[in-house]
């Protein structure tokens, strides 16, 4: 599943020698399968290992991965490079981001980006956006809810973040329109 070069194994062994006895390595996948997916390494104290973790054994240490992340780490490579900044670990995980098939209908592709890229950012303010439809004249029709409904920044968010992102990824779209009947309430972010 994960290949760790000899150089990287030696470096990780050196780092682990400075940690509490029994500490291993954990590979984490954040937002797996989405365009904002990230992969990282962390120390893994032995008391944080669960039955749902997959254990990968190497010569001097073990790597733990949660079961849900395994398919995203297939063919992953961890290497070590030395440059002017010092030693750096590099993680290459070719299956970290699911490819959106170009044959998938535009509505589904746009919705996937809204769910995986846009809504996680809006959730920081208690809001979200729902894709209602894409019109025949190629406008994405959306509706805000939660903290976004009634927020004084909603026009800015729509034009400068949502529309820019969607037009960048889907040039066939002509724009994004808001269908929301905005009512400022105690739950509105601003």
Curated annotation (Swiss-Prot):
Keyword Chaperone assigned to the entry: answer is: no
Gene3D superfamilies cross-referenced by the UniProt entry: Fe-S cluster assembly (FSCA), HesB-like domain
* Cofactor binding notes: Binds 1 [4Fe-4S] cluster per subunit. The cluster is presumably bound at the interface of two monomers.
Keyword annotations for this protein, in alphabetical order, are: 4Fe-4S, Iron, Iron-sulfur, Metal-binding
Residues binding [4Fe-4S] cluster: 148, 151
Q: Briefly, what is this protein's role?
A: Involved in iron-sulfur cluster biogenesis. Binds a 4Fe-4S cluster, can transfer this cluster to apoproteins, and thereby intervenes in the maturation of Fe/S proteins. Could also act as a scaffold/chaperone for damaged Fe/S proteins.
Subunit-level organization: Homodimer.
The entry assigns this protein to a family as follows: Belongs to the NfuA family.
Full protein name:
Fe/S biogenesis protein NfuA
Q: Which organism is it from?
A: Baumannia cicadellinicola subsp. Homalodisca coagulata
């Amino acid at each position: 599943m994960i290949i760790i070069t000899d150089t990287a194994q030696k470096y990780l062994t050196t780092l682990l020698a400075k940690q509490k006895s029994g500490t291993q390595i954990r590979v984490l996948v954040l937002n797996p399968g989405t365009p904002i997916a990230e992969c990282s390494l962390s120390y893994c104290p032995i008391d944080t290992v669960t039955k749902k973790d997959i254990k990968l054994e190497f010569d001097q240490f073990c790597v733990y991965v949660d079961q849900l992340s395994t398919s995203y780490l297939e063919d992953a490579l961890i290497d070590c490079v030395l440059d002017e900044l010092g030693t750096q670990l590099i993680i290459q995980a070719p299956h970290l981001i699911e490819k959106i098939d170009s044959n998938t209908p535009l509505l589904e592709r746009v919705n996937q980006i809204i769910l995986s890229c846009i809504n996680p950012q809006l959730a920081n303010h208690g809001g979200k956006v729902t894709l209602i439809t894409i019109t025949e004249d190629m406008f994405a029709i959306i509706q805000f809810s939660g903290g976004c409904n009634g927020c004084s920044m909603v026009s800015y968010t729509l034009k400068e973040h949502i529309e820019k992102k969607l037009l960048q990824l889907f040039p066939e779209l002509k724009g994004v329109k808001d269908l929301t009947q905005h009512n400022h309430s105690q739950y509105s972010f601003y």
